[in-house]
């Protein structure tokens, strides 16, 4: 009773002060007038603001705009020389800026980029009121892959001249990235032979049946009536048979090249060294060799989530700034053949050799160690995996023995541990933060070009963070 009486007194007081800016006990007077900031979406602006005022000072879009403006874009403009006003494409500098910003912020699809050009403020500022279609964006990216590789080199060289990147230690690593192809669109060589034979038999049976139908129709209607259209079921089988035959030929050509590199010749039969016969004829792949119908240049590789059609993307990263100074891409799952080419590209870009090279056990090899020693580069490369410790070095491999002794010291172990903190965060940032796990272009050359765009965008974003720090 006492509580109910108190509530009635509070409600009476609230009615008496309604419309005033007061509190009544635990009640808030919800119908009191409140002044809000004005909001008129349909109000036209007499003097519209500059688009640059839509973004805060120091925004990544402004940094990328200034960076692209400082680059030599002659390679990008070259394909348009002589077009005049007959065909007016979008400004290549604007297209480069938009693509770099898109990749730096995790947008890789040309359709999504085109949609962001209409909906995202930063994209509208970069494009300056231009709205290229998704097909235009995709064609521009594909047409200028070589130019983007040159721009990557320019950006690293600018960082070198500015003193951001110095000739010190490089950490090297690779990562398997999905190709623009499904592993379910691949077929083994053994199944190709079986499937090709089956399809040829079905085609022969269908042709026999079609000829019998033609003879019957000629007898019924006369030989002048057209009836030469290819049956749909026969056409489908012929197309599939041709596709399988082409894939089978690619596998055989690939195997023949591998056999030549191993010293075999087409006329050696199956007689090997020491009269030990080869397991197969020259140029004949094993039954489990596979080819993909969608992207024949991609390969089945083992990843952390299983086996898939992939390419192997490689990077060399500067120790002090985590700037990518060299890139590579291959369709070979093994890393050991990629270290020296990466070092060569880094030397060409930076104008000198690094002092140290840090890499995991996938890059080990006596020949590689000897080459690095001859070039005055100190290697800190693991000789074994965590689950498979390193075996004692072969006594004949003197460079490997010296590296093992170096890694056994406290200094060597500390230097090698730095590898994880230098290169692995960069790959993790590309795959986890940006979300780049799958190529959007098919073929090794095009995938390599897109990998250069990704690494260029990562470097530009890294420069932006270093500048803001």
Please place each PLM-identified region on the residue numbering.
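Anion-binding and metal-coordination hotspots
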Residues: 37-38, 99, 107-119, 130-469
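Intrinsically disordered, low-complexity and often Lys/Arg-enriched segments
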Residues: 1-39, 469
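Hydrophobic alpha-helical membrane-insertion signals
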Residues: 23-62
């Amino acid at each position: 009773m006492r509580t109910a009486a108190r509530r009635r007194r509070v409600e009476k007081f609230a009615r008496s002060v309604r419309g005033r800016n007061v509190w009544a006990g635990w009640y808030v007077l919800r119908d009191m007038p409140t002044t809000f900031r004005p909001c008129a979406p349909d109000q036209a602006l007499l003097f519209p603001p500059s688009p640059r005022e839509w973004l805060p000072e120091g925004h990544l879009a402004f940094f990328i705009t200034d960076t692209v403006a400082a680059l030599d874009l002659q390679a990008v403009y070259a394909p348009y020389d002589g077009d005049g006003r007959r065909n007016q494409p979008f400004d290549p500098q604007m297209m480069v800026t938009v693509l770099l910003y898109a990749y730096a912020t995790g947008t890789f699809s040309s359709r999504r980029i085109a949609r962001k050009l209409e909906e995202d403020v930063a994209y509208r500022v970069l494009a300056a009121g231009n709205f290229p279609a998704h097909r235009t964006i995709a064609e521009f990216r594909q047409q200028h892959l070589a130019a983007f590789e040159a721009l990557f080199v320019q950006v690293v060289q600018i960082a070198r001249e500015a003193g951001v990147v110095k000739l010190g230690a490089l950490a090297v690593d690779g990562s398997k990235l999905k190709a623009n192809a499904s592993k379910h669109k691949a077929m083994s060589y053994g199944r190709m032979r079986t499937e090709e034979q089956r399809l040829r038999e079905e085609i022969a049976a269908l042709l026999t049946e079609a000829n019998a139908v033609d003879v019957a129709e000629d007898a019924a209607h006369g030989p002048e009536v057209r009836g030469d259209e290819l049956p749909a079921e026969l056409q489908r089988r012929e197309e599939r048979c041709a596709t399988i035959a082409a894939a089978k030929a690619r596998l055989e050509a690939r195997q023949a090249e591998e056999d030549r590199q191993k010293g075999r010749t087409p006329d050696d039969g199956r007689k090997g060294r020491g009269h030990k016969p080869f397991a197969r004829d020259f140029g004949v792949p094993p039954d489990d060799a596979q080819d993909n119908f969608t992207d024949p240049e991609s390969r089945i590789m083992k990843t952390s989530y299983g086996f898939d059609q992939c390419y192997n993307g490689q990077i060399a990263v500067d120790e002090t700034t985590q700037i990518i100074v060299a890139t590579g891409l291959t369709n070979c799952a093994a890393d050991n053949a990629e270290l020296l080419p990466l070092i060569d590209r880094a030397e060409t870009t930076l104008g000198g050799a690094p002092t140290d090279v840090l890499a995991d056990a996938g890059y080990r090899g006596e020949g590689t160690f000897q080459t690095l020693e001859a070039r005055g580069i100190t290697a800190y490369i693991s000789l074994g995996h965590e689950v498979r410790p390193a075996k004692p070095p072969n006594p004949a491999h003197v460079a490997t023995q010296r590296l093992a002794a170096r890694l056994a010291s406290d200094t060597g172990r500390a230097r090698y541990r730095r590898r994880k903190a230098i290169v692995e965060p960069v790959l993790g940032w590309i795959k986890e933060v940006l979300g780049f796990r799958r190529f959007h272009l098919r073929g090794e050359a095009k995938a390599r070009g897109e990998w250069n765009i990704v690494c260029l965008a990562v470097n530009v974003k890294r420069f932006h963070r270093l500048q803001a720090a």
